[in-house]
Amino acid sequence: MVMGYRVGIDIGGTFTDLVYFDEYSKEFHVVKVPTTPKSPDVGAINAIETAKIEFDKINILIHATTLGTNMFLGQEHLNPPKIALITTKGFKDVIEIGRQRRPKLYDLFFEKPKPLIKRRDRYEVEERIDANGNIITPLNEEELQKIAEIIKKKDYEVVVISFLHSYKNPIHEKKAREIIKNLCSNVDVITSYEINPEYKEYERTSTTVINAYLKPLVSNYLKNFIDSLKNKGFNGKFYVMQSSGGISNIKYATERPAAFIESGPAAGAIAVAYFSKILNDNKVIGFDMGGTTAKASTIINNSPLVTNEYEVGGEVHAGRLIKGSGYPVRFPFIDLAEVSAGGGTIAWVDEGNALRVGPISAGADPGPVCYGKGNDKPTITDANLILGRLGEKLSGGLLKLRKDLAEKAISKLAEKIGESVEEIAYGIIRLANTTMAKALRIVTVERGYDPRDFVMYVFGGAGPLHGVELAEEMEISSILIPPSCGVFSALGLLLADCRVDKAKSILKDIDEVDEEEIENIFIELIEEGLKEVEGFEEIKIVKQIDVRYKGQSYELTIPWTGDLKELADNFHKKHETVYKFSSLEEDIELVNARVTIIGLLTKPEIKCYEVKEYKPKPESYRKVYFSSGWEETAIYNRDKLKPGAIFEGPAVVEEYDSTIVIPPDYTAFVDKYGCLRIER
């Protein structure tokens, strides 16, 4: 391959971040531009042009986007497709009934999420396969042909086929797809056995419907983006980041868009995992605060924790999606907790005259009040500006902040409550920190971990403004700010590997199977997965099994080492870690076999420098507000801090893509990789 550029582009709710690696100079470069919500690809092209990269010299471009998330946030300019669902007779209401959990037990006015497919667009056909894969009732092809005629007349764009127990025997779904395609050649037909071949009909149907819901939008978006790139001379490889933390080719991305809903946050977790390995930090919390939301993840032994079920379109409450308030998706997702607290999150006063922060965001347009684009509702960014934590210029001086406008907006809140402007601004920061701390507790305490045992890696455009105070609230003693922290998720795109996940239901007691039967299932899954991971010199295969005590509803995923006794022992240990108890006498059930096939990519090298300890000279000083009040604070330029620099707080470190706040009584040190480690 001719030397050129490797480019990572992360489109967030407020900014589009670009990191590129120059294969000639072996240097990383970064660019940050406003997101263009109605046409996200325009912002991405703007970022490349701002970076002055020649399109024909881009060898690899890896992309993460919020497009899937935005679809479930009801953005008006995103038009969902017209979808029909065909299912087993008697089961067309499965996606409406869902699971009988009440996410808010005492809320008499709670409304379940509306089904993505209306009842009039759901059709039933006579067929039945039992839980063992045996045909009880043959597929009624004549009935299906009548449904196909209706589909043709009503101009559906996508048809979802989800039959009972098709994960065990997909013969009826295959035949139904064939009949529909023969009679409706212009309709895209998606079957549940291809998207999610696992038991639980509601989750399988929901996953397939969400995939269908996203597919036309994502396919058109990616096609337009790639066409725009090619028109400008791009001829390199194009990959998309999945929610699992692995990248995939364009074909996989367009066929399974539901696997890409949390692609941006996943890239951030991958960057944290990479740095935790080179820095020998085995327990790490990743904290990412951008313009719209804040996310937390847990990295243990250099690998992010992954969950096999996620909810989209649900309510965000205390850092988590309330189970039952959204739509379940069964794809691997990096286990994240997310809250509505970003730089653009709006502060307001409620009917009881109490200060509130979020969940509404000013977004990329108009943005915070201090951007001067017409917004008059104060945000977290405005509060940081008033408190002196932010300077009056961002992005290397490209974005000038209007402190006078921020003060005017926050003074309105101050008048209502009867406090000073700085007290209200500091109250906004404290409320935001309280909300974000809940997310940190979810990925640690609620997963069975003590946060005091962890190092916290802080990144995102707004994360380092809040990271140290958040760590203090969680009693975390060591904080690390990586280089290019404001575009760290985009950097993570360049540090990821290609990944394909395959699964198959087992649903047998552990004493009903032997190692040979399990290995045969894995052989089948590996053969299937390898077809989708081609062209890689080095491939890694990970085998896992979902395990539970018999009678439980949810499983724990345990590595498969080839020995059933070892599997059982490891399950008991993990159950003890997660739930604080285990039961050695209980029967164990094997639910799903899972294979992850990883095509290893060559990573750009993170440069290491000689460390010579010295005390740097501040660029200037300014007053900054902390818990103790206004403090004369040293201001440093991060680009001028060399490895070995050591200095004490209070301090503010400014760089192109972010600003780092170091309160009094903390010491900061620049390590050999350019990371800023802050300790008390």
UniProtKB/Swiss-Prot annotation:
Annotated GO MF terms: 5-oxoprolinase (ATP-hydrolyzing) activity
One Gene Ontology biological process: glutathione metabolic process
GO-annotated cellular components: cytosol
Alphabetized Pfam families for the sequence: Hydant_A_C (PF19278), Hydant_A_N (PF05378), Hydantoinase_A (PF01968)
Residues that span the membrane, as ranges: none
Family indicated by similarity: Belongs to the HyuA family.
Protein name: Uncharacterized protein MJ0964
